[in-house]
Amino acid sequence: MLFGMSLFATLFTPFNHSLPWLLISSLLWLLVYLLTRPRLHLNRIDASVPLFDGLGWANRMTLARGWLIAACGGCLAIPAILEDAAVVVWIAAAAYSIAAIFDRVDGFIARKTGRTSQLGAELDTLFDALGLMVAPVLALLLGKIHWSYLLVSVAYYLFVAGIKIRQRNKLPVYPLAPSQLRRTLAGFQMGYVAVVLWPPFDAGVTVLAGVGFMLPLLSGFLVDWCVVSGRINPFEPTQKALFENIKRATDTVAMPAARVLLTAAVCVAWSADPFTRTLDIPAVLLVLVSVLMMAAGVAGRAGAMLLLMVLAWNTPIAVTEPLFYLCLFISIAILLLGCGRYSLWQHDDHWVNRQDGA
């Protein structure tokens, strides 16, 4: 299939460019194979039950994610033509976006078909890390992210390397407590990178947004490292209560206050310069609907996604304005954490937690 895509690429690029694409994509697909093959014995729910008969549709979708990431990664071999051959960027963005969608549904399909497995869980984590290694580098070449976002690309590998070093030095490695937030933050990184690869979104906005997506994930890795190294014990009653209090304060105080602040910021921005001067009517309606959704807590995450799309597509507020920063980073916080208490309808929160929490 990669060879077929290479031939397809020759319709838009010279053959001497499609050949390097094929080489890098093939090497990445080989890596996908090498990551998968030694883990086939994990194609079961746990060690006490027999292996499943075949991979199943969910694992096939996960492997397809690896293939799509490889196809996207091939563009790293042809950076010189990315600005001139826009169709190549569109294809790469589409490939990674489909991979991100598969990441959202493969676990759901595994549960619906009764084929959840250790193999699927491991490959899911490995391909998340691979995708967040490949796609951000491509986004950096396109000028869509700041170089510091590459810390997200290496964070997982540094974390795993740190654990192996502790094990090699006979130091204890403590277990992590289950966390829905950990998986949610990682999943939204894929979504962020998938969006910024698309050409229409403004680089000035996507670079800033990267800070809002990056810092919570890196903070999570730091906390997790403190846990596995024994500096924090989330199972100890006092420290467990501290984490619960932080979560409670976030849900009951911080996020509701953020929604009020966002609504006020949009109202102030509107009074200073009505959005109709810079946006067409459908875009203005999207802004108003998205802000109302977040203010009322009605599918607030979906509202945050809508507002972020508008800000990145054609922002009605100058990027240099403090109000823009408020709108951008509060929307990202709501997308990652939800609207919190005093929300009218939080089905999107339940969907995110159900999908990411398994």
Report the location of each language-model feature:
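Cytoplasmic-side transmembrane-helix entry/capping segments in multi-pass membrane proteins
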Residues: F52-G66, L176-R183, G303-V310
